[in-house]
Amino acid sequence: MPTRFSKHRKSRGDVCAGYGRVGKHRKHPGGRGNAGGLTHHRINFDKYHPGYFGKLGMRHFHLLRNQYHCPTVSLEKIWTLVPESVRKSLAAKNDGTAPVVDVTQKGFFKVLGHGILPTQPIIVKARYFSKVAEKKIKAVGGACILVA
């Protein structure tokens, strides 16, 4: 073994200082990986990984998650999702430009048709639209875009 690769050049007597001759440096004295986490490596695990071992609480075996989770937003609340600065600038221009509102980014999936929309057009992106909501948005010159 070239000495320039060893951790210390001077091997002092040279019997297995290069760790050769069948396992003289021994293999894995502390065990591999997370071995000994409850015994000889316990201090490390308790300090840096508290709660790694053991159980806590009870599992809910037959938990049924809501498969039809679909948070909704009404048309009357749609303009509150547009930033106020954008609202004012659009009202001042009045040239027909429409803001794009992605309700999925705000945590809603479906747009419902309750309420009255201003006459200003608006582009709404959502996963679902009710028929009334779609009709009202298109009536003011807006657009409904379906998002996956």
UniProtKB/Swiss-Prot annotation:
GO terms for biological process: translation. GO terms for cellular component: cytosolic large ribosomal subunit; extracellular matrix; ribosome. Keywords: Ribonucleoprotein, Ribosomal protein. Residues 18-38 are annotated as: Disordered. Pfam families: Ribosomal_L27A. GO terms for molecular function: structural constituent of ribosome. Belongs to the universal ribosomal protein uL15 family. This is Large ribosomal subunit protein uL15. It comes from Dictyostelium discoideum (Social amoeba). The gene is rpl27a.
